[in-house]
């Protein structure tokens, strides 16, 4: 077996129709994500990050609850930048410490989420990117 050296290698090994990320407890319309869909989304996310001046070596903090959306965000961002998942239960002072320590270029939060991470990022001049889950 060859050595996997990056996210692209990991995504490439899955058959197009194979399940890459499951969505237990979701409605049938919210089906699991296939490797083909995850690869396509990773390309879109990397392109979007690059258009916003974020690339390899740049740190992107992610504040999302555990679940398929977090897994997808982590994998797709990691395809083009350094991911730094942060606990959504952190307090404002903890987010301040970690966002400073990470030197994050962007923060991803769920649309409409009132996390203190958002206010900290805005005060620090860190771009806040909102994840809009596809619930159809």
Where are these regions (language model features)?
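A short N-terminal helical cap/helix-turn-helix that marks the beginning
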Residues: 1-22, 40
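Residues at the C-termini of beta-strands that transition into short coil/loop
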Residues: 11-14, 25, 36, 111, ...
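A generic structural signal for alpha->beta connector loops
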Residues: 18, 29, 80, 125-126
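Conserved AMP-binding/adenylate-forming core of the ANL superfamily
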Residues: 20-67, 71-75, 91-96
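Structural core segment of the AMP-binding/adenylate-forming
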Residues: 51-52, 81-136
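Hydrophobic/aromatic ligand-binding patch that stacks against planar heteroaromatic rings
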Residues: 75-76, 120
């Amino acid at each position: 077996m060859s050595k996997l050296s990056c996210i692209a290698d990991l995504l490439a090994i899955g058959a197009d129709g194979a399940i890459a990320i499951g969505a237990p407890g979701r409605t049938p319309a919210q089906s699991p994500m296939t490797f083909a869909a995850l690869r396509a989304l990773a390309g879109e996310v990397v392109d979007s990050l690059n258009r916003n001046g974020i690339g390899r070596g740049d740190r992107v903090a992610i504040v999302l609850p555990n679940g398929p959306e977090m897994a997808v965000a982590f994998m797709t961002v990691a395809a083009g930048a350094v991911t730094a998942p942060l606990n959504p239960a952190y307090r404002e002072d903890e987010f301040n410490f970690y966002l400073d320590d990470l030197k994050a270029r962007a923060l991803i939060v769920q649309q409409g989420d009132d996390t203190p991470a958002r206010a900290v990022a805005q005060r620090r001049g860190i771009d806040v990117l909102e994840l809009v889950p596809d619930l159809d």
